[in-house]
Amino acid sequence: PEWMPSGLVNLGLDLRGGAHLLAEVQLADVYASRMEAQWPEVRDALRSLTPVRREEAPAGELRVRLNDPSKMAEALQITRDLARPVTTVTGAGGSDINVSGANGTITITLSDAEKQATDERTMQQSLEIVRRRIDEVGTREPTIQRQGADRILIQVPGIGSAAELKAIIGTTA
């Protein structure tokens, strides 16, 4: 009859068997690598003003020590000029970095707007990578979706175990 749905009913993992995995995306590592990549640009920009050296800093933060602290104001301006505009989902613009200075040291961190934009980009890329790797295996009807701010839910029918699923995805998605 026409009133009956024509599509097939998708059986869940409980009825069909398969693997369920909740993967966490390491966003803090992305922030840290962004700051790592910022160092050569900052160093080269400040080199003509005064010699600089990198100082130990928490992950996701870059600290640069000026050899000549009297040039702090100029150094801060040069560093702020390295900032790029950020366009977020809301369309609000802002700078990608926060720059501050004290006692001859410049501290650079990612702005909240850049962290939000980076989170979105990283999660989208991670979802695409996981989806592509699972599709390569030819599994039918996998569920791959974002869950919360930094997690990806992966459910694949027909796969024997979570270990097998991890092997398909790989350790660095």
Protein language model regions, located:
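A structural signal for conserved, well-ordered secondary-structure elements
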Residues: 1-173
